[in-house]
Amino acid sequence: MNIIQTFEAEQIARLVSERPVPEFVPGDTLRVLVKVVEGERTRTQAFEGVCIARSNRGVNSNFTIRKISYGEGVERVFPLYSPTIAEIQVVRRGDVRRAKLYYLRGRSGKSARIAEKARSTTTETAAAE
């Protein structure tokens, strides 16, 4: 590992210790709580939608969330380790077979729905024990 990769690994470890990042993949519905500064006040704003893409590039990793707001599609790209993100919550797990879900841009209504991933029984029984 060269010095740049070592430095990036240390930075990622530091950032994850400050704010843990949940495991999520494209197709999952996420709620991202973003810190918004208005004058002197700071508040958190929720942005909930389907993760349509994720780019794993070390410290520069990002993910794209798409939601429908008042009939218009809204997409937002979030840097994964950004200090403006207060929290990332996984609302539901989606069952998709693609890494990039850009085809959802051309769909609306029922055709844009994503099936929920069935829960595995092995993890539930292991958690019960």
Swiss-Prot record:
The keyword GTP-binding does not apply. It comes from the Bacteria. GO terms for molecular function: structural constituent of ribosome. GO terms for cellular component: cytosolic large ribosomal subunit. InterPro entries: Ribosomal_bL19, Ribosomal_bL19_CS, Ribosomal_bL19_sf, Translation_prot_SH3-like_sf. This protein is located at the 30S-50S ribosomal subunit interface and may play a role in the structure and function of the aminoacyl-tRNA binding site. This is Large ribosomal subunit protein bL19.
